Amino acid sequence: VSMWLMLLIVGVNPWVGIVAALAYGLSTYFLLIIGAGHVTKMWALVYAPLMMGGGWMTLRGNVWCGAALTALAASLEIGANHPQITYYFLVAMAAFWISEGILSFKEGRLRDFLLRTAALAAAGILAVGSNFSPLWYTAKHSKETIRGGSELAATAETSKNGLALDYATAWSYGKAETLNLLVPDFMGRESGTTFPADGQTAAVLNDYGLRGAAQQLSAYWGTQPYTGGPTYLGAAAVFLAALGIALARGRNKWWIIAACVVMILLAWGRNLMGFTEFAFKYLPGYNKFRTVSMTLVVVQWAVPLLLSLIHI
């Protein structure tokens, strides 16, 4: 529902919005985190699209209604208590804000943009204020955890200012593994599973005299230590998103494309260490989070949005 409401705010046809919202809600990542019991992450992903919709309305539509919606949605988002998900969507919001700022400057609407920015900032302050107590104690106690760094020598899990780079990037998405977004099980299934005894892999191995070997081989051959399954967005959804990129107006699509590219590069983690090290050093707060492959949640949100843009 949150995704559908965001699409209505953007101006998508309600029926198209239903299809796009289902593409978001039925992506495999939701099923994986529900099965793993990541309830706070799930709720953060539920509220995030509405927060983005509020930001869209504030910067492009009715500024006061947008600010009110942003304050409400951001309050719920922060209250879901998964700062990592919130952080990634705020990065996407920043991409949108930068895009609007550049366009406003070119069109001579800088004063209006600054007013809308002030309203958006006020909404953010209200959202933070409504969650001040848990945020305060989280920030206070994080200094005593591995996310707060260490005054002693760096360990395998901590650095001077936050998590150690190797520890934070342990769950890095492989470059080829990114094709899981389009092709199901491109790098295999979840860790701990093996190939079926009556499958084609077993048949080929049997021809070489390796009977029973298929039941001892892992059905996942990606670069992550283990995984609950691939992040599959749907071939149809990705194809329609590509069509949306080709046909949509530039104002609507470039910031989304930029956010997707950045998030995919960040998800590669140790497989693109130069970019990851740069983000760790210079992107505020980024070194507090592990499992960098989680940045793909923004791509999961962006693909249904991109496929809807051709109807705006």
Regions found by a protein language model. Give the residues of each.
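Conserved small/polar residues in nucleotide/adenosyl-binding loops
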Residues: 310-312
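Membrane-interface helix-loop-helix junctions at transmembrane boundaries of multi-pass membrane enzymes
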Residues: 105-118, 198, 203-215, 240-270
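Short secondary-structure boundary/capping segments
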Residues: 37-39, 92-95, 139-155, 278-283
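Periplasmic/ER-lumenal interhelical loops and adjacent helix-loop junctions
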Residues: 132-244
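Membrane-embedded helix bundles of polyisoprenyl
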Residues: 2-10, 14-104, 116-138
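Membrane-helix boundary/interfacial segments in multi-pass membrane proteins
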Residues: 30-43, 218-231, 262-302
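Carboxylate/His-rich catalytic cores and anion/metal-binding grooves
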Residues: 2-31, 234, 238-275
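Membrane-embedded alpha-helical segments of multi-pass membrane proteins
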Residues: 42-51, 86, 90-91, 233-236, ...
